[in-house]
Design a protein with these regions (language model features):
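NAD(P)+-binding Rossmann beta1-loop-alpha1 motif at the extreme N-terminus of oxidoreductases
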Residues: 1-47
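Rossmann-like NAD(P)(H) cofactor-binding subdomain of soluble oxidoreductases
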Residues: 55-56, 61-124
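N-terminal short beta-loop-beta anion/metal-coordinating cradle
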Residues: 41-61
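Short, charge-rich amphipathic segments
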Residues: 13-26, 51-54, 97-103, 107
Length: 124
């Protein structure tokens, strides 16, 4: 099984490390300093509760074309970035790919200048 974490910041990297710990083949899409840190150092997951550590070195890239087609894609981006990256998923998709949204960071202005029921609604 191949799973891609699309948006591997803190939450995405944590999910990816947990999946790798379970023996699943995981690839991470991330960028900038976080990408460089993962490529150079891998991921170290530490549990404050149990005191255990888990180290892994997943395939990490900023280019979805570097990764084979996936069985699952977990999108762990901030809400304001999700729509902008939808087209970037296409190289990862096959007919049976499942895409799971784990989007976070819904800002108060999310509905600003939208139409319909939620037009200009302020998230509280």
């Amino acid at each position: 099984m191949n799973i891609c974490i699309f948006g591997s910041g803190a939450i995405g990297s944590y999910i990816g490390a947990l999946l790798m710990q379970s023996g699943i083949n995981v690839s991470l899409i991330c960028r900038g300093e976080h990408l460089n840190a993962i490529k150079n150092n891998g991921l170290l997951m530490q549990s404050a509760e149990s005191g255990t550590e888990y180290f892994c070195k997943p395939l990490a890239t900023d280019n979805p074309k570097d990764i084979e087609k996936q069985d699952f894609i977990i999108v762990t981006l901030k809400a304001h970035s999700a729509a902008l990256t939808a087209n970037m998923l296409s190289p990862l998709l096959k007919e049976s790919t499942t895409v799971v949204s784990a989007v976070n960071g819904l800002p108060w202005w999310y509905f600003y200048k939208t139409s319909g029921k939620w037009k200009n609604y302020r998230v509280k």
